[in-house]
Amino acid sequence: MHNSSRKTQLLNSPQNLTIATTGASGAIFLRHLLSLVDRDSRVRIVNLVSSDSALRVIAEELNLRGRTNLVGQLLGRASRKVHQQSNADIGANIASGSYPSDAMIVLPCSVGTLARIANGIASHLIERAADVCLKEKRPLVLCVRETPLNKIHIRNMYRAADAGATIFPLIPAYYFRPATLDQMAHEFSCRVLAHIGLPQKDAYRWKGETRKSGFNSV
């Protein structure tokens, strides 16, 4: 990459991120996403918000306990970059459009959170921060985790997308033949970050295939 292109990429890369996690299964994906942004030198600030339901899911899936030091528990180390916010603090910095948050990721995003965001119900910080992203035309990525989907879920995804959000379902890739759940979570997190302008150097990239089987693609 030429120096000028690299400088342009650095200038355009989001430096101030909001990451929210809600009460849908998939806490391991959050852990990998946080680890990636914590080590990414392009990212300067990360505001992390978790719902009460998310804390329960994290406790059950990752065997972590308590509301305090959630960042340290998820990362396994202290972080100067990632700051935990209370979902009850509706007056936090990320609740205002004047605060320079560059993008927001909700991972995983429950269908309840999706419904509130899609319909402009902002009674907690997560929904308010998402509402701010929509009104300020900032990237908002909703990693919805639910199956099967009913008509209400689908309509809410359409409504959120129509308002400006990206619906990024929590569906991992299989074509790179992951051997572990950690590999799947890592690659999914890399794709989410690439979507907002933070491509990761160690992300898997499909290079096409050399047909040896003799079968034609359908």
Residue ranges: model-predicted function:
Residues 2-140, 148-218:
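A cross-family phosphate/adenosyl-ligand binding-site feature
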